A protein has these predicted regions:
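N-terminal positioning helix adjacent to the helix-turn-helix/winged-helix DNA-binding module
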Residues: 19, 26, 161, 222, ...
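Helix-turn-helix
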Residues: 22, 26, 30-66, 233, ...
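Alpha-helical DNA-contacting segments of helix-turn-helix folds
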Residues: 59, 67-73, 269-276, 319
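Hydrophobic alpha-helical connector segments
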Residues: 82-110, 286-313
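Amphipathic alpha-helical segments used for helix-helix packing
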Residues: 103-128, 166, 309-329, 369, ...
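Amphipathic alpha-helical packing segments from all-alpha helical-bundle domains
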Residues: 126-150, 159-160, 187, 329-353, ...
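Hydrophobic/aromatic-rich alpha-helical bundle segments in the mid-to-C-terminal region
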Residues: 149-215, 352-398
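Conserved small-residue-rich
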Residues: 166, 170, 212-280, 284, ...
Length: 408
């Protein structure tokens, strides 16, 4: 009897002390990998090893769980930079410490850090404001030492520098390229310092706006118009929140007319992203015809990539925010096209900077491309239109600094 009682006691399962932390980590990783709408409470509960009813005892709804996960990530950025408010070191030392702290937090959350970057649109009004407050506080903490180190920077330039620094560091959550932790930390640190040291152009200067092109030509027919309208709606509302009726209305056709061209909404997303990636890749390759100097070739690619992204802001953002809604096969096809583009840039960068390994060069290319979206959103590139020459020049300069490692 004593033995039986002991055996019964041995199988009693006690709740781990870090259950809340387990739930927070599992939910953040799930939402980041699959998107808000695709994740279920049951899936998160299973990942933690509890039942869905048990999970509901911690969080009243999926939205509550999502909100807590997003704001917890933002709070980690706030907490790791708290010291800057009372730091009495030299501004350069404070900036170095800020960079190191932000890199450490980002690497610790590499599986989930994309959540606040790409899924935060699903936060409700007050929660969206709370996240915005967190990120503004972190940016201002970065800008404070910059005001002393670089007193001639204007406020918009400081914001581009701090946002660019956060973008370069945060870009590591958007891919799975592996390096030893110390090596990737040093690489991101050097890139972040180059970005905040970049000599940004002055707005009163005259800038030649590089030629740009729309990836989808709506004047060529309903097919292209459907792709263009769909991408704009997916970017504005999110793929899951966009209906076929809204797409049809934007193009001026009945809903039934869409099915002459696409079997369903997922096919529109897959076709739009894949076709855009193919066309951008082909366009960029054509620019390099007959050229041989890798540094010059990369500079031309940067110019064309920025101009194309500003002319097609919906597509630049959707690649990051909505690809989780593709089927696994379509995700792999899209990754293959993107990988080919990244590889082409990587080879040029490795040739231009022989001290870099190919893996290091690949990470820097990802960082440079992330700048276009992150800083582009800061300057509202979707609304820039004919006034985009100056912000484009700034983004090009930040990309130059990231890739070539120079602030000037």
């Amino acid at each position: 009897m004593t033995t039986a009682r002991a055996q019964g006691a041995a199988v009693v399962r006690r709740r781990p002390k870090d259950r809340k932390d387990q739930i927070a980590r599992a939910s953040a990783e799930a939402f980041s990998a699959q998107g808000y709408h695709a994740v279920s409470m049951e899936a998160i509960a299973a990942k933690v090893g509890i039942s869905a009813p048990a999970l509901y005892r911690h969080h009243a709804s999926k939205y509550d769980l999502f909100r807590d996960a997003v704001l917890a990530l933002g709070q980690q950025l706030v907490d790791c930079t708290d010291f800057a408010d009372t730091d009495d070191r030299e501004p350069g030392e404070t900036l170095d410490r800020l960079i190191d702290a932000l890199i450490d937090v980002t690497l610790a959350n590499r599986e989930s850090g994309g959540l606040y970057r790409w899924q935060a649109r699903y936060l409700h009004g007050d929660d969206q404001s709370a996240l915005g407050d967190q990120l503004r506080l972190v940016n201002r903490r970065i800008q404070r030492p910059l005001m002393v180190i670089r007193p001639t920077l204007t406020s918009p330039q400081r914001w581009m520098a701090s946002a660019g620094m956060l973008s370069v560091i945060g870009s590591v959550v958007d891919h799975r390229v592996q390096l030893p932790t110390d090596e990737i930390r040093a690489l991101l640190r050097a890139a972040a310092l180059a970005v905040v040291g970049a000599e940004l152009p002055e707005p009163e200067h005259t800038f030649e706006r590089p030629s740009s092109w729309r990836i989808f030509e709506v004047d060529t027919g309903v097919y292209e118009a459907l792709l263009q309208a769909s991408m704009a709606l997916f970017n504005a509302k999110g793929y899951p929140e966009t209906s076929m009726a809204e797409i049809a209305s934007a193009v001026g056709i009945p809903v039934s007319g869409i099915y002459r061209y696409f079997p369903g909404k997922c096919d529109i997303l897959a076709t739009g992203l894949r076709r855009a990636a193919d066309r951008v890749s082909g366009r960029l390759s054509a620019i390099l015809t007959g050229l041989t100097e890798p540094g010059h070739m990369l500079t031309l690619l940067i110019e064309a990539y920025v101009a194309t992204s500003f002319a097609n802001p919906d597509l630049a953002a959707i690649y990051y925010t909505e690809r989780v809604n593709l089927t696994r096969v379509d995700q792999e096809l899209l990754r293959a096209v993107q990988r080919s583009t990244i590889d082409a840039w990587m080879r040029l960068l490795a040739a231009a900077r022989p001290a870099l390994t190919e893996t290091q060069a690949r990470i820097l290319v990802h960082a440079a491309m992330a700048l276009v979206v992150d800083v582009g959103r800061l300057v509202h590139y979707e609304d820039a239109g004919d006034n985009s020459a100056y912000p484009q020049a700034c983004v090009r300069k930040l990309m130059d600094a990231t890739l070539f490692g120079t602030g000037g």
